[in-house]
Amino acid sequence: MAASRSSITTLLLLIVAVALGYGILPISAKTSVARQLREQVDFVDAAALSESATSSSSSSALDHKSSAPGEATNASETEHSAASTASEPKHEGPTMMSFVGPAAAGVLAILLIGAVIAFKKRMNK
């Protein structure tokens, strides 16, 4: 009886140590497919906006001889770079706190299962 309790306790401590060990290691988050598609759509929209801005500014440059064509290109490039930097959110990897909740829930679940098993064994005697 004492041997089974010590083996269960050892097993629980081993599981907790492994869970906490993996929680401390830095893990890089991979970008999801949905985020990649959203960024691609934003990029295509920004490219279409800059293209339409270039065509409208070049047509207005043809109408007005005073404006230089290089200024219109620089303006559209500035708009495109501003749009692309504004649409890209800054993502950091997961933090330690993002692992504490699931690790605690797992430990509590294991303890609850162990308590139920111990209770059933005690009731069968």
Swiss-Prot record:
Biased composition (Low complexity): 51-87
Record localization: Secreted; Host cell membrane
Motif extent (RxLR): 35-38
Main location: secreted
Span list, region Disordered: 51-96
Recorded GO CC terms: extracellular region; host cell plasma membrane; membrane
Keyword Transmembrane listed: yes
Name of this protein: Secreted RxLR effector protein 55
Organism: Plasmopara viticola
Gene encoding the protein: RxLR55
